Amino acid sequence: MKRVVLTGTGSGVGKTTIATGIMKALSDEHKIQPFKVGPDYIDPSYHNCATGVSSRNLDSFFMSDGQIRQSFKNGMTSSHADYGIIEGVRGLYEGISPTNDIGSTSSIAKALNSPVILIINSRSLVRSAAAMTLGFKALDSRIDIEGVILNNVKSQKHYLKTKEAVEKLANTRVLGGIERDNSISMEQRHLGLIPAVEQERISGLVEKWGELIRENIDLDALMEIMDNSNPIINEYEPIWSPNKTKHKTRIAVPFDEAFNFYYKENLEALEYNNAKIEYFSPIHDEQLPSVDALYIGGGYPEIFKKELSKNTTMLESIKEFSQDNHPIYAECGGLMYLCKTIDSLPMVDVFPYHSMLTKRVQGLSYTIAHVQRDNPILKKNTTYHGHEFHYSKVEYTGSNSNDFAFSMRRGVGITGKYDGLLKNNTLASYIHTHTACLPDFGYNFTQSAYENK
């Protein structure tokens, strides 16, 4: 399977612009399967726009090496891709530890035995770009850095000087350089880039990135690197449990401006377990569709709180669904939506607490949670991994730890100690999870949906 990892020396070097531009440029003549390293919903939305193919996340905190390879294989096979292009996260070696590579781009490159392209912010650099390249190559001999892309060069003259330095002093070929251009930058929000689903101009912007890549990057050289990818180790592990619910169920999944943070494989795990996904909009539709369960992902409900609050028939239908004991699982933005209010505006009110946006980040971490109560997705006395990233908080005014399904071993959750409000058969948590670290997610949730029809 032909592939490449596009990584950077750090955050803010232009990985998403360059990776998405490469995906767009190559998609004109080839089938591209995009991937993103780490727990990220926003960058993949740009990949989807560029390729017309759902991007998948690869993460060594969530996944074993065998699961990383399986997820990569699943993506390449399902899309019949010619090339797999993997956008890294932060710097090549950044993970959860200063001394190992768990959660890093380098761990993904090694699990997939993939060639790597290093993106360098070349502003005011010439020979130092060569030094950076040498350092990144020297830190781990198992990382195969096959090329460099120079971003933010001042001029053609600057590019040629820096290219010569990297190729002669670091013995690494330079595939091209991108000059500084503020017109190609993306709008930011508190969780990062604005999701592509919201931006009407995104298709034009992605097209511009593709043109920029066609004009400045040696795509033939890049494809040659991918064509010569070394074999992937033939050791795979399943992403979800082979146990399968025999009964057919229908599961509602909101997907609109407010809610659009979902991992592709979570939805596939539900479908594997005979669930039919019914997509709907809490903003635009009048009520919940006729279903057996509800899965509310994250997103930006705080940005669309007025629209959500005005849709009273939808709010009432979801509250009644919870009161009727049908299973609901909600993550982050879904948790806020199920609270009494968001920034004082009425919401579903399954949980009698107020949620609000804050100026400072409240939770930004991989998480480890211990399950203290049975719930629609997990059984008591198990432990699972996830992640949280939120500039919001829920003002929990209760005093009973039994209100929560999870006690936190790593991360903040709702109270700093607990997460996962549980009422009726409704679970709402700040933790986002991936089926790779929760292999029974699809089975448990669909089984609960069937048992509580």
UniProtKB/Swiss-Prot annotation:
The keyword Endoplasmic reticulum does not apply. One of its GO terms (molecular function) is cobyrinic acid a,c-diamide synthase activity. Residues 250-440 form the GATase cobBQ-type domain. Its EC number is 6.3.5.11, 6.3.5.12. It catalyses: cob(II)yrinate + 2 L-glutamine + 2 ATP + 2 H2O = cob(II)yrinate a,c diamide + 2 L-glutamate + 2 ADP + 2 phosphate + 2 H(+); Ni-sirohydrochlorin + 2 L-glutamine + 2 ATP + 2 H2O = Ni-sirohydrochlorin a,c-diamide + 2 L-glutamate + 2 ADP + 2 phosphate + 2 H(+). It holds the Pfam family GATase_3. The record marks 432 as: Increases nucleophilicity of active site Cys. It comes from the Archaea. Its cofactor is Mg(2+). GO terms for biological process: cobalamin biosynthetic process; methanogenesis. The active site is at 332 (nucleophile). HAMAP family: CobB_CbiA (MF_00027). Belongs to the CobB/CbiA family. Comprises of two domains. The C-terminal domain contains the binding site for glutamine and catalyzes the hydrolysis of this substrate to glutamate and ammonia. The N-terminal domain is anticipated to bind ATP, and cobyrinate or Ni-sirohydrochlorin, and catalyzes the ultimate synthesis of the diamide product. The ammonia produced via the glutaminase domain is probably translocated to the adjacent domain via a molecular tunnel, where it reacts with an activated intermediate. NCBIfam families: cobB, F430_CfbB, PRK01077.1. The a and c carboxylates of cobyrinate and Ni-sirohydrochlorin are activated for nucleophilic attack via formation of a phosphorylated intermediate by ATP. CbiA catalyzes first the amidation of the c-carboxylate, and then that of the a-carboxylate. Catalyzes the ATP-dependent amidation of the two carboxylate groups at positions a and c of cobyrinate, using either L-glutamine or ammonia as the nitrogen source. Involved in the biosynthesis of the unique nickel-containing tetrapyrrole coenzyme F430, the prosthetic group of methyl-coenzyme M reductase (MCR), which plays a key role in methanogenesis and anaerobic methane oxidation. Catalyzes the ATP-dependent amidation of the two carboxylate groups at positions a and c of Ni-sirohydrochlorin, using L-glutamine or ammonia as the nitrogen source. This is Cobyrinate a,c-diamide synthase. It comes from Methanosphaera stadtmanae (strain ATCC 43021 / DSM 3091 / JCM 11832 / MCB-3).
